[in-house]
Amino acid sequence: MAEGEITTFAALTERFNLPLGNYKKPKLLYCSNGGHFLRILPDGTVDGTRDRSDQHIQLQLSAESAGEVYIKGTETGQYLAMDTEGLLYGSQTPNEECLFLERLEENHYNTYTSKKHAEKNWFVGLKKNGSCKRGPRTHYGQKAILFLPLPVSSD
């Protein structure tokens, strides 16, 4: 197989009834630490909730380039951002604080590092109680930084 080629297995997809990948659909970001879903509220507050029916947990991930994503709340229209203190907040407009480096880890969870603060290794993270973990308090290996993208519907 040449570099860059993609092979699809239509027969396997039909046989096992696997869903086709669609990155345009909203996702839920489920945090391994405490079982919370990342949420962006209308006032710009970012936290976690276990309530799967909360409309503010539906997030639209869009790629700026390979491995770089914007995370936007579909209900609020606000972008997830990290300020110079490492605090997460919702921004009305996309800016350099809203760009995150998405990485698929060996355990199949994703991590999101602030691109602006990439040299500091500041991750998006949630504490066990659902509150945000400041960037400087996060580091590789913590459960707080592990997120599993899930489909919105429970089907």
Swiss-Prot record:
Q: What is this protein called?
A: Fibroblast growth factor 1
Protein's UniProt keywords contain Nucleus: yes
Region spans: Heparin-binding: 127-143
What InterPro entries would the database entry show?
Fibroblast_GF_fam, IL1/FGF
Q: What keywords tag this UniProt record?
A: Acetylation, Angiogenesis, Cytoplasm, Developmental protein, Differentiation, Growth factor, Heparin-binding, Mitogen, Nucleus, Phosphoprotein, Secreted
Q: Which residues form the propeptide?
A: 2-15
Origin organism is: Rattus norvegicus (Rat)
Q: What is its main location?
A: secreted
